[in-house]
Amino acid sequence: MIARDHDRMQLQQDPTAHAVLLTLQGTARKLGTRRLSEVTIFTTHEPCAMCVGALVEAQVPALVFAMADERRGAAGTVIQLARESLLPHQISVISGVRESEARRLATESASV
């Protein structure tokens, strides 16, 4: 694991402080490059369009997520940006990995 983070939108009052973006920033800093062509991103929730766009720009080859996002998912659920052939880079997507565990954790953290 190179970097990890979580959403900080509420804490920072910043609509761009998504976990995926913050993790990309940390990874790029640690590796000293903006091209993350050997990095796989693992996330609990399916990324939004902004986050998938950043993954495309960073040339991330693979994305693995647990839970689909029925409202904003941009890796196949609502729209498919990750494998859009009109974009300069496509991302391999694996969804549903450890989904039941992720849902349980999300429910527990929401009730705290």
Model-derived regions, located:
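A structural microfeature
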Residues: I2-A3
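Short, well-ordered turn and helix-capping elements at secondary-structure junctions
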Residues: D7-M9, T27-A28
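A short, polar/charged loop-to-alpha-helix boundary motif
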Residues: R8-L22
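Immediate flanking context of iron-sulfur cluster ligation sites
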Residues: T33-H45
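Zinc-dependent deaminase
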Residues: P47-V112
